[in-house]
């Protein structure tokens, strides 16, 4: 009986430990070097959990002030901040003609797509995250051009 109780406590501890481990992804460098990281399973899961860091910056999805006050370019990434210096958007370019819309859609199918449409020079797909969203922009040939996390 005592062994069963220890097993149960051990399973509960393991369960609690698994719940606290949130997926994360940290990208440092030029995002235009190789756009395939946008297809990485860990990147997709980290997006869902609002836990992606690009060049040392991560969107603060908890802030209520989403108004952009300043912007900072780091490598080929644009970081938008509110008046308090909290990151509200991160936009990064990707390598041209590398990731097709179909490839992106397949890699991100575990996340909820909330919008899809056309732009003047291509198309876009917007996905919901736990507390925010991200939008992928595609050129007229259907290749990923940039991603905006907010």
For each of these PLM feature ranges, what is it?
Residues 1-17:
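Sec-dependent signal peptide cleavage junction
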Residues 14-150:
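A cross-family detector of function-defining hotspots
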């Amino acid at each position: 009986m005592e062994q069963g109780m220890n097993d149960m406590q051990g399973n509960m501890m393991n369960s609690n430990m698994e719940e606290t481990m949130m997926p994360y992804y940290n990208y440092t460098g030029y995002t235009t070097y190789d756009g395939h990281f946008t297809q990485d399973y860990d990147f997709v899961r980290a997006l869902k959990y609002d836990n992606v860091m690009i060049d040392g910056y991560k969107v603060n999805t908890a802030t209520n002030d989403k108004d952009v006050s300043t912007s900072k370019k780091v490598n080929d990434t644009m970081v938008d901040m509110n008046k308090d210096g909290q990151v509200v958007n991160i936009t990064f370019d990707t390598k041209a003609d590398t990731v097709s819309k179909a490839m992106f859609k397949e890699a991100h199918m575990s996340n909820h797509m909330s919008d899809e449409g056309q732009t003047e020079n291509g198309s876009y797909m917007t996905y919901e995250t736990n507390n925010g969203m991200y939008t992928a922009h595609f050129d007229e040939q259907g290749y990923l051009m940039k991603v905006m996390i907010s």
